[in-house]
Amino acid sequence: MTTPEWDIYVVDEVSEWIDALDDATHERVVQALDALAEGGPSLGRPLVDRIAHSTIANLKELRPGTVRILFVFDPWRSSILLVAGDKAGQWTSWYEEAIPLAEQRYETYLKERAQEEGDQ
């Protein structure tokens, strides 16, 4: 019996950021995304960790190397990649900018997705 994979939605800014990565980093990110699609919410450390100090209760980060991708599982059982970056050399300050941005993008995503779901 095969386990169904989780859908992953990617905001445009994250998609563009991933596309611009060097080959080695891109490959690490793709492997991490494959693991996320396969493991879903059961995926844990060291690849996934929970983010504190956010208004989103279940905000998490995907952690391939020094790359961080903030994501959340939405009410439709999908994951949405909200913010991505390489926090090398800025281990604390990166979150001060990334968390509010993730919260804003998630709010926008929820509104758009709810409209789409309502139209079906």
Listing of model-derived features with the role each one plays in the protein:
Residues F71, L81-L82:
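Conserved catalytic cores of phosphodiester-cleaving nucleases, focusing on short active-site segments
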Residues M1-T66, P75-S79, D86-Q120:
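Basic, Lys/Arg-enriched alpha-helical interface segments
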